[in-house]
């Protein structure tokens, strides 16, 4: 028998004995934990770069990246017609809306209820089969918890049990509870189909519904996020960084997607519109015409013109404020980005990296060439109003708190290292030191950790005022700084893309991480630094769209690195050739699911259309992975060992059992 140092652990064991006051209860818990360790591991889903495309994202959650459709095919492949299977899937994804359609068209609704309830129970039984009854029970709505448990655990091979199940189903229908039951069990199926959701950054920008996505995530059962550069930009805006506020508004105007700003967060853009119309009334603002896609494609000429004027107005203010912040922080080494100071306003040229370029336009009525980064009086008043709107927006701050609660710069789950973009490297593949606070340089894991701490400093009430001010300023560096782990490029060529036709200036040199990440040794070195161990370890990233049309492969470094930005954003569909990836990690291994564009929620409900997805097997295990093989399994093993030590303490008289009252 194993010997324990009871005296050393006695205080902890006494606390543990309060939860398990008898030998019998401690033994029962050991049995339960051992049983859980031998269940198949739960299914993890990895998504990245959602960029406000809420309809496609929510549909992927509802269909579990095609997993529910696959299970319906396995269960009813030869017994149901294709349309019936599509309708069943559609009912699981959108129960409330689908029920309305069915009730308008179905002649014998009670018969439909009876058949459908049995089918839904069969699907629910299948998706819940890898979980303990306790975990399933916790996922059930209170109203139907007992009934669903009875239906899931009664097998209809027995004639008496069949009658029992039929009576339950008939009673659900006869009491008028069929609709509520269908909605409840459909939501349970959705919930159990995804055990853990990992979002590798960039919920915000480009698409119209980041606020809708975050409303969903506030209520989602189990998820985490590794912040992306666009998420951090919105965090900076919420914290009061005026450069971030300008960038957020500029990007929304660039894609003519103001839904998140105006409808989601109630940000008042009327002062900006008024200022832009007055200031740029005679300016065609050609370079600032919005990129139109999706719902924004139908903008009329008048709205498009106003959007371009607002776009230019906020861009000019942004470049001025960025210039001020860069001057305030010479340690960022970004002086070359103070480009308003390098314009020859008489000639209409700009000097970039020592070379003079002609500008496509040079109409800047609010710029004083002597003090080009100084805001005009009207611009100052405008930015104060916008700053106030962001600072007092309760819903925005609620969403940022959700991202802080569930998020971090990096995470390690089951031997997989997750981060959005980059781990800065030197040319030789060694980890690069980056200064994130004057005099404080970090690399690798420490860089990610302390960057995350810096972000949190900006939102903590008890932060040192000087540190908090720096943390708020630093959001701009995280967005576009050359050594930022969320950017890692030589520059962000926003100014050049607007004002310089020569495309040589648009080039953004990628950092060494992006150049070396196909090298297996480099990837192994990074994983070693982060303490990621095991024979099947990986890095998973988003950030850089995988251009499948050009033959790019999301699997790199001999399978050790996976890049899963497949272009959820409609703006990138033509570049990537697809509409996003989901990486699925289940008990049999990794599968990469490639999605085609989603038509609409309305089509999914009315026509039963689904996202067409193709699955690529990335890595299959030679045996089924169990809970014992996961991070949760390691914790459960520790709990088992602690309970064994408690049993030893009971049996050797170190701790006395306590009598428990019998119910």
Where do the language-model regions lie?
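Feature recognizes metal-dependent phosphohydrolase scaffolds
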Residues: 1-663
């Amino acid at each position: 028998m194993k010997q324990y140092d009871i005296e050393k652990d006695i205080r902890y064991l006494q606390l543990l004995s309060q939860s398990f006051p008898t030998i019998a209860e401690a033994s029962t818990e050991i049995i339960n934990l051992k049983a859980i360790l031998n269940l198949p591991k739960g299914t993890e889903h990895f998504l990245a770069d959602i960029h406000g495309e809420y309809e496609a994202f929510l549909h992927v959650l509802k269909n579990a990246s095609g997993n529910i459709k696959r299970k319906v095919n396995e269960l009813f492949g030869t017994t149901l017609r294709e349309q019936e299977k599509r309708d069943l899937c559609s009912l699981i994804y959108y129960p409330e809306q689908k029920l309305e359609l069915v009730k308008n068209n179905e002649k014998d609704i009670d018969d439909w209820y009876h058949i459908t309830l049995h089918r839904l129970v069969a699907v629910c039984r299948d998706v819940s089969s890898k979980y303990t009854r306790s975990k399933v029970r916790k996922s059930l709505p209170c109203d139907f918890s007992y009934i669903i448990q009875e239906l899931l655990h009664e097998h209809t091979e027995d004639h008496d049990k069949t009658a029992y199940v039929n009576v339950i189903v008939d009673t659900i229908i006869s009491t008028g509870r069929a609709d509520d039951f269908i909605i409840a069990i459909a939501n349970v199926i959705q919930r159990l189909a995804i055990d853990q959701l990992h979002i590798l950054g960039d919920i915000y920008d480009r698409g119209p519904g980041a606020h809708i996505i975050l409303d969903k995530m506030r209520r989602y059962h189990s998820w985490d996020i590794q912040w992306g550069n666009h998420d951090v930009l919105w965090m900076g805006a919420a914290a009061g960084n005026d450069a971030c506020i300008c960038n957020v508004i500029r990007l929304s105007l660039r894609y003519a997607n103001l839904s998140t700003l105006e409808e989601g967060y109630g940000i008042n853009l009327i002062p900006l519109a008024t200022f832009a119309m007055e200031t740029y009334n005679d300016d065609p603002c050609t370079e600032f015409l919005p990129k139109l896609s999706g719902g924004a494609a139908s903008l009329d000429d008048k709205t498009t013109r106003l959007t371009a004027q607002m776009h230019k107005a906020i861009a000019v203010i942004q470049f001025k404020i960025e210039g001020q912040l860069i001057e305030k922080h010479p340690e960022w080494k970004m002086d070359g980005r103070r480009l308003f100071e390098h314009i020859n306003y008489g000639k209409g040229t700009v000097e970039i990296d020592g070379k003079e370029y002609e500008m496509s336009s040079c109409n800047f009525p609010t710029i004083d060439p002597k003090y080009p980064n100084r805001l005009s009086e009207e611009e100052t008043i405008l930015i104060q109003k916008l700053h106030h709107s962001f600072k007092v927006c309760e819903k925005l701050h609620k969403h940022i708190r959700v991202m802080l609660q569930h998020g971090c710069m990096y995470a390690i789950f089951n031997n997989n290292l997750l981060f959005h973009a980059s781990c800065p490297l030197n040319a030789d593949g060694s980890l690069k030191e980056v200064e994130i606070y004057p005099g404080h340089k970090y690399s690798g894991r420490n860089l990610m950790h302390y960057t995350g701490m810096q972000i949190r400093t900006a939102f903590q009430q008890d932060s040192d005022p000087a540190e908090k001010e720096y943390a708020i300023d630093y959001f701009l560096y995280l967005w576009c700084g050359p050594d930022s782990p969320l950017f890692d490029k030589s520059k962000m060529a926003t100014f050049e893309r607007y004002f310089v036709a020569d495309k040589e200036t648009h080039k953004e040199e990628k950092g060494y991480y992006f150049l070396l990440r196909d090298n297996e040794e480099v990837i192994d070195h990074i994983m070693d630094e982060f303490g990621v161990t095991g024979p099947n370890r990986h890095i998973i990233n988003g950030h850089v769209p995988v251009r499948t049309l050009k033959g790019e492969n999301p699997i790199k470094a001999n399978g050790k690195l996976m890049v899963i930005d497949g272009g959820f954003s409609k703006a990138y569909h033509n570049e990537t050739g697809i509409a996003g990836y989901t990486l699925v990690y289940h008990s049999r291994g990794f599968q990469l699911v490639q999605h085609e564009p989603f038509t609409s929620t309305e089509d999914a409900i009315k026509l039963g259309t689904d996202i067409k997805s193709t699955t690529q097997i990335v890595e299959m295990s030679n045996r089924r992975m169990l809970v014992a093989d996961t991070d949760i399994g390691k914790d459960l093993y520790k709990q088992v060992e602690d309970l064994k030590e408690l049993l030893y303490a009971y049996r050797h008289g170190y701790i006395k059992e306590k009598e428990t009252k019998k119910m």
